[in-house]
């Protein structure tokens, strides 16, 4: 599965704000869960399928977090079977100062 990935050190209550050009799955995962996700295994995450943007996910605890965006399972558009253009942005709204632990 193809996906966009970004790893960030985030603090509790920071907000991950996603803009996307189409319906997508957004996951906020720990390193261990991201490894499982990459390998097709069971994983837990914060987020889900979003069709309204900006999507906002609050960070549950301070640490390193993996943000993924994918459009798995989305249908081709009606323009001759071509895929729609996928654009996205990931912004972090810091509610506290960054502290590497």
Give the role of each language-model region:
Residues 1-101:
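Acidic, Ser/Thr/Pro
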């Amino acid at each position: 599965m193809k996906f966009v990935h970004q790893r960030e050190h985030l603090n509790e209550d920071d907000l991950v704000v996603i803009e996307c050009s189409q319906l997508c799955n957004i996951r906020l995962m720990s390193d261990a869960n991201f490894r499982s996700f990459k390998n097709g295994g069971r994983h837990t995450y914060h987020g889900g399928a979003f069709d309204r943007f900006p999507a906002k996910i609050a960070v549950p605890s301070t640490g390193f977090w993996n943000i993924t965006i994918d459009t798995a399972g989305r249908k081709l558009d009606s323009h001759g079977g071509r895929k729609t253009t996928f654009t996205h942005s990931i912004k972090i709204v810091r509610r506290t100062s960054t502290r590497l632990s």
